[in-house]
Each structure stands twice: as C-alpha cells, then as structure tokens.
Amino acid sequence: MTHHVTLTLPFLLAGALLASSDAAPGMNRFAAAAYRQLAQNLAPDKGNLILSPFSISTALSMLLNGARGQTAAGITAAIEQHAGPGYHAAVAALAAELTKQANGGGNQLAIANGLWVQQGLPLQSEFEQTMRTLYAAPLTPIDFQAVEQARQTINAWTAQHTNDRIQDLFARGSIDAGTRLVLTSAIYFYGKWHSPFDPQNTRVEPFQLGGGGTAEVKFMHQKADFLYGETPAAQILEMKYQGTPVAFDILLPKTNDGLAELERSIKPEVLSAWFGGLASRKVEAAIPKFRAESAFSLKDMLSRMGMADAFERTADFSGIDGRRDLFVGEVAHKAFVEVSEEGTEAAAATGIAMHALAMRREERTVFRADHPFAFFIRDTTSGAILFEGRLAQPAS
C-alpha cells in the first residue's frame, strides 16, 4: 500500500532580506522558471500572481532530503539546483543569514519549517536528523485518521507563523486518512521603506486593469532619489527597505498591455542585467497601495518542470521511512502581500542589455505604475529573489 505526502507552502510577502549562499543562484533559476510557468497559465487579464520561490525551494529541498533515484533527480531538476553533499547545509546557511540580516530596525523576518508525521510511522534517522538540525523542522506526531483535527492543527501552526495572515491553508477534504506526512514552510516579513511615502500625498486615481477597464485605487506619491533604469520595453524602479540590503523592484511595461510579453523575457541573466544597470535618479513615483493574495496548487507546474515522478505511486522516498510506500499527493501554495506608505508586509533572452538613459540628472523622470506590472523582492548583495509576483488588479 502506498500513502501520500503533502507539501504546504504558506507565504507572507512583505519585504525580504537575503544573503549570499551557494544555494542562491539555483533558487534564482527556479524563481525565473516558476514565474514563467505560472504566468503562462494565468494571463495578466486573469488576475494577480504572488509566490515565494525561496519558500517553495525550501519545502522541495526538505522533500529532496528523503528522495532517492529518479525521484531525487526529478526534484533536483525542478528546483534548478546542483544538489551535492553540502546542498542542505547551504540552504540552511542561507535561511540563517536571511534571518540575521532581516530582524531589527523595524523589520521582521520569520522562517519556520514543520514536519508532521503519522503517529507510529518510523523515519530514517538520517532524514530526521537533517530535518531537525539543518531545516529546524522538528518531527511532530499527528493522527491523520482524525482528519479534521489534523487539518485544524496544521492550519493553526501556519497562521501562528505568518502573523495570522495565512488562514485555512488546508481546505476541508485536502487532508485525508491516507496522508502520512506533511511538510510545511512558512515565511512572514514586514519591512519599512528606507524612504516612506507621506500619507497626505496619497490620493485616489485610476488604474488600468489587466482585463480592460479601470479601477479607482489609492496611489502613493513621492519625489525622491531612487535607483532607476529602462529597457526598450519597460521602466524599472527600485525601492529599498531601511537598514537592510533588500529592495522592492517594479518592472513596469511601457504600454498598458505589455506585461505578458515582459513576463516571457524573465530569466535569471536578464534580471541580473536589468537590475545591475540601475542608476540613481530623482524620480516622481506614483505607486498603488495594494493588498493581494494567491492560492493555487503547484502540482502541475512542478510536474512540467521535471518532478512528475514524485507524484506517482512508484515514487522513491525510501530515504524518509526506508520503504517505497510514499508519494506526493499535493503541493499547496498560498501567498499574501500588502504595500502601503510605511512599507511592505507579506506572509513571489532577448533585450538583456540595459541602455544608457540620455538625460541630464535634473531632467524630470516620472514612474507611474498605473497599469499591470511585475515585482520582485530581492537581496541586492547576492541578487537572490525571495518573493516575486504580478499586480494586475490592485483591488483584489
């Protein structure tokens, strides 16, 4: 008899802080690939898109810890990593450095991992030790036969570790008596802008919706020095959080309907070139206040990215319990992001080269984000992406 494993990925976007690590380049490759995959299935006229590639990668890395053979190879391919002997330690080091840099100065970053195991299910000692020591995910015995109680227990843990921003991650019916193990990875971040927006300058203005029409939205206004750049198809604005190397980058298409084309060009080397070409400018910025969330299954996306074997009953997760009787039933994702005058809260080729802006410093530069755009929250030291997404409907 085979049983299934469920991965839960409760994300709370809000700002982000990252540090350099051997795991970061692979996470960025995964971040770009995941964005393109999800964007292909959710066009800008269909709504917002929010994900945390860091959280997804972390949860899948925990799963990789117990995978063997072709199943392990598929997960490794999906997360775009070269998972050598020191890989899990590198992921742990990245999380530790993030937490160290993020907290303080009014900012808060919390990363929490959980391992929920059916009572009486014996685990391999090496798997359990790696989960406990590197991923800080202690084993919690739970009775999945008591389905509703198990669901509520894990949902309560998720809410607790996301400042109550992620509620009811598991809907009724998503956990059943066949569940044997649940992996959870939760992130909460609150970051204050280095240069806050004055609420007195916030006013209601029209935003061009992805599906056509407009919505009346509160826009924050500020004229200040920002890192700014342009590509032939987009403007790029970077807003920093105080006391950290983390920034919020907006990729704003130059046309109202240009986001889909821009999203197709998102690749690690493209983003690196764009962000690396930014320069300080005095910019008149108009940014919408918004609060949005995404909730969807990642199962189909991850299958397309190479790990279909993990979802089959023939999967090899013998590194978890010593037997080949486990497979992944679902990978659930839920994300939240809120941007306001004070900061951010969240529980994320061609035309690579930047071109020089032919302008004098005193010339007027306007950045008006009044139509669908993409955003990234990343560490500017390593370039690692913690959160990414698309805003197409600010009122959603």
Task: List where the protein language model places each region.
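A structural microfeature
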Residues: 387-389
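Non-catalytic, conformational "gating/processing" segments within enzyme and secreted inhibitor domains
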Residues: 46, 82-256, 261, 274-364
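Detector for small/aliphatic-rich hydrophobic stretches
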Residues: 1-145, 156, 360, 380, ...
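Residue-level signal for well-ordered, solvent-exposed loop/turn and beta-edge residues enriched
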Residues: 213, 382-384
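Short loop/turn motifs at secondary-structure junctions and domain boundaries
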Residues: 366-371
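Generic short beta-strand
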Residues: 374-377
